[in-house]
């Protein structure tokens, strides 16, 4: 399996503009009189281009502002990018997210379960609220950490531009949602569809969301957590 630390480290790569930084539990060790004994310099290397990392960050912000990760939003308005994840019957619930300051991962699950006479796990208890509960736990912790920090946005690389698109078919639309693109990769055609789904489409999507829980995905080693 994948640990919360590994997930936080992967998402940390996105938060750091595409650079992976090895997680560490300390930065320096000093003597009682302030002399430096050990300086812990973590390994770091570029994994993806800054522009690619930002486009993913832009997408993941939408998970919090208008998707399944709404409960991860911070009370002071500092932007959050992240993703929820659940397994079948909500036996496991995740939220991994980051801000311009920190990255963190929350996991909720019944690791003990009900066992038979031989000690084998035969059933596990589902998580009430699923990934929404994991997102809420994330914001509860992060609200305290970000309490006195200044609101700031994620840094936008120079080769990124924004245009409005129709979320249904991906075409350009003056009444659509703003989305980030790398220069030269944005949509050239205009959408011929309404920017919002019809009521019947919304009902269908809602039914699908209620019956098919999302599956957590492991990002391609995308912020290195600050500890």
Language model regions located:
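A penicillin-recognizing enzyme superfamily signal
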Residues: 1-192
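Proline/serine/threonine-rich low-complexity "mucin-like" segments in extracytoplasmic/periplasmic regions
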Residues: 178-227
